[in-house]
Amino acid sequence: KLFDGVPCPLANKKPGDIDMLIVRENTEGEYSSVGGRMYKNTDREIAIQETIMSSHGVDRVQKYAFELAKLKGRKKVTNATKSNGISITMPFWDERFNKIKKKYPEIKTDQFHIDILTARFVLTPEWFDIVVASNLFGDILSDLGPACTGTIGIAPSGNINPENKYPSLFEPVHGSAPDIAGMGIANPIGQIWSGALMLDHLGEKEAAKTIVTSIEKTLSIKENRTKDLQGSSNTSQCAKAVLDNIN
């Protein structure tokens, strides 16, 4: 989401133009550990890694994307694919998507291959509402999307158990950033916004809304922003500004 006052690296984009959700499958797909290496240390060495897509896993994430669209009042779900090149798993992914979307006739859908989809993220980010993607594609898009708003430092994420049978986990898209630990330059917004996502997931809608509103107020003033957003605040100062705006 592009906030008011935050410098956008994309030309002629303003707050309201970029506000998308990336729904990523996070238990199987391209990041399975099925495979191995053969003929090591020879000139015929081979490395193989399999993509695993199950109807259970694919249906779960795609259904969640549509249910999220209903819950959040979003109007469109975009399918990220590459079935013109990945000839087995991606056609399967598309088949499941085309089946599931029929259960949600009130929600618009479209589909793009991942290469042109990334180009469209940069050229026309306002086109997108909710994008559902495999593990690898979702990993890429969930970094590219925030970068289009100026920094990945503000982007939140959640590893969701849709059935609420088990705990869900919330963290910034950028992870723990150990390379800058203790330097006071990390943007705390991603962590704070992840907390708001958690509250929203737990049903604390007003508390979540209060935090997001405070984030918007904080980022609208340049001095409150960290260096990645051309501001002058350190981590603690930026976090304190968010807290002060809540109070």
Language-model segments: what does each one mean?
Residues F121-E223:
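Glycine-rich phosphate/nucleotide-binding loop
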